[in-house]
Each structure stands twice: as structure tokens, then as C-alpha cells.
Design a protein with these regions (language model features):
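Pan-zinc metallopeptidase signature
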Residues: 243, 247-303
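A short, structural micro-pattern
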Residues: 5, 59, 113-115, 237-240
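Active-site-proximal segment of zinc-dependent metalloprotease catalytic domains
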Residues: 42-172
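Intrinsic-disorder/low-complexity loop/linker signature
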Residues: 20, 36, 50, 94, ...
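The catalytic-center signature of Zn2+-dependent metalloproteases
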Residues: 127, 135-255
């Protein structure tokens, strides 16, 4: 598509499970669910009772990606949500990352969690669609990797987007945090136009206004043009075509900016509950501060 920052992070499907057993399919474990199905992702990921932590592999060694059918949330849009992720934590101190919930605990073990720290993907959109194809853009099969068709349900973009959240990135449009009655913290698009992702090199825009434009455009055009649906009007500056991985559809969904890369690298190097080598000794018993018992963390869930 175009230029993007190389984050130098490689995701590898596990070949063995947490207990050392070889997996039949790398990266895949099938687990029986005894609760109501389909599953509400907000209720599952926001549950603070500890009953769902057993579904996790050690978050300090693995990124847990749960795939299941999302329940229709009634008045909410859960059933049509493509994916949801927990945001990471940042440790209090000189390397703390703006916008993330802080913690003093450098070494957080799975046994200390009350909730299932993970990414959730709506498996409805990982299956074949009504036409027999998959929910994805045609760029993956095209020899030149150029897209002539953009799927708003592209599961590849969805997973990349949610992993961006998991590694510290917010949306590339104006949003705000919402403290919900059930004790969970989520985010929602803002009515105004502000830069809220803590990255100055990603133009922000009013998502609510864009959705009004798209609804009108789709009703008045039988054959939508890709350039038209990608068009964004930023809070300041010139119009542009959406390409950032942290935007919502319609977007090319491939670009990571320099400041987004810096946030990801900060989380990789300094945050607990994130796999990989650390510069501050996080995730080790020599980290200096290890709480005992269950921790009262404040998870943020973001779509």
C-alpha cells in the first residue's frame, strides 16, 4: 500500500500449550465453554470475580486471543463488534506512558488477576460469508497486493487493530473514556474533534460526523468509490485518505506512525503482562515490587 513504520515485532503461534503439551494446530486451543452462548465480550472481559482467569495462558509469556461468537447486546452493538481488547498498564516512574492506567506492580502473575486480560475476536467474521468467501479485502490474494475491494469486516485488519490496542495504541479519531455502571471502563467516540490518541503524527477526526456522511453516501451511491469512503476531514489541516491501523472502517488499515511505534516499543520494554524482554526487569521476581494476593487493577476495554 505505502510506507509504514517497522515496529520490529514478530508474533509467533505457540506450538506447545502452557503445560508443555504439543498443540495439534499451532496457536490454537479448543476449550469447552459451559456458560451462555454466544458470549457477551464486555461481560466476559469485564468480569472481576476471577472465574474466567483459568481460560488464560500466562500473559507474561503469551498474548491470549479468544475467538467466540459475540452475543447481541440488545441496546448495545456487541453482536456486530468485530473485536475488543484490554489496554496495557504502565508502571509508575520515568518510563510511564501517557494515557494508560498506572500500576506500581512490576511483576504481575496470572494468579493475581481477577479478570481475563486478553483480546477477543468475533468468530462470526472469521468464518466464510454468505458468498462462500472470507471476510477480508482482496489485497491478500492479489499478486501486487493492491486492493480493489475493502471489506469493513476484514478479520486480518481486526486482529492487527486489536493487537495495537493490546500494545498501547488508542483510536485515530476523537474519543473519550466512559466509566460504566458495572465498574468497567470503555471508550466511545466524542462529539467534538480532539486529538486523543497521544500521537501528534496521526491526524484526528470526528467519527460521529464521518458516520453521518457514510450513511448518506451509501444511500445515494449504488457503486461506492473507494476514495470517497476513505476520505477523512481532520480536526485541522487538509483532508486525507484513511490508512492507519487504529482507525475504523472504511480504512486501508495498514499504517503505523513513528509515534505509534514508540508507544508500542515502550509497552514492550516496560509494561507488565506483556511478553518479551524488558529493560526495567518487569515480569521477573527481581523486579523490586511484587504484590501478594489478588490485585485491584483497573482494566480498560476498548473496541
Amino acid at each position: 500500500f505505502g510506507e509504514s513504520e517497522n515496529v520490529n515485532v514478530k508474533f509467533v503461534a505457540a506450538t506447545y500449550d502452557e503445560k508443555g503439551n504439543k498443540l495439534d494446530t499451532p496457536g490454537v486451543e479448543y476449550v469447552k465453554w459451559n456458560g451462555t452462548y454466544p458470549i457477551s465480550p464486555l461481560k466476559f472481559m469485564g468480569d472481576n470475580s476471577g472465574k474466567y482467569v483459568s481460560y488464560l495462558w500466562d500473559p507474561n509469556e503469551y498474548i491470549n486471543v479468544m475467538m467466540y461468537n459475540f452475543a447481541d447486546g440488545g441496546d448495545s452493538d456487541e453482536g456486530t463488534v468485530l473485536g475488543i481488547s484490554h489496554m496495557p498498564y504502565t508502571i509508575v516512574g520515568s518510563t510511564a506512558l501517557e494515557g494508560l492506567e498506572t500500576t506500581k506492580a512490576k511483576n504481575i502473575q496470572k494468579r493475581q488477576l481477577k479478570y481475563p486480560h486478553c483480546v477477543s475476536i468475533n468468530s462470526l467474521y472469521a468464518n466464510k460469508n454468505g458468498n462462500g468467501g472470507y471476510y477480508e479485502s482482496d489485497r491478500y490474494a492479489n499478486s501486487n497486493h493492491e486492493a480493489t475491494y475493502i471489506s469493513p469486516f476484514d478479520v486480518v485488519v481486526t486482529l492487527s487493530h486489536e493487537l495495537g490496542h493490546y500494545l498501547g495504541l488508542f483510536h485515530a479519531f476523537s474519543e473519550h473514556k466512559v466509566e460504566n455502571a458495572d465498574g468497567t471502563t470503555t471508550t466511545d467516540a466524542s462529539e467534538g474533534c480532539y486529538d486523543t490518541d497521544y500521537c501528534d503524527d496521526t491526524p484526528s477526526y470526528n467519527r460521529t460526523e464521518y458516520m453521518v456522511y457514510i450513511e448518506y453516501y451509501m444511500k445515494s451511491h449504488t457503486t461506492p468509490r473507494l476514495q470517497d469512503v476513505l476520505l477523512r476531514t481532520p480536526c485541522d489541516g487538509d483532508n486525507y485518505l484513511s490508512a492507519n491501523i487504529m482507525d475504523y472502517s472504511y480504512t486501508l488499515g495498514y499504517k503505523i506512525s513513528a509515534q505509534q511505534k514508540a508507544r508500542i516499543r515502550n509497552v514492550m520494554y516496560y509494561s507488565p503482562l506483556i511478553p518479551g524482554p524488558k529493560k526495567n526487569g518487569a515480569n521477573t521476581r527481581a523486579a523490586g515490587y511484587e504484590a501478594e494476593g489478588k490485585l485491584d487493577l483497573k482494566p480498560v476495554i476498548i473496541k
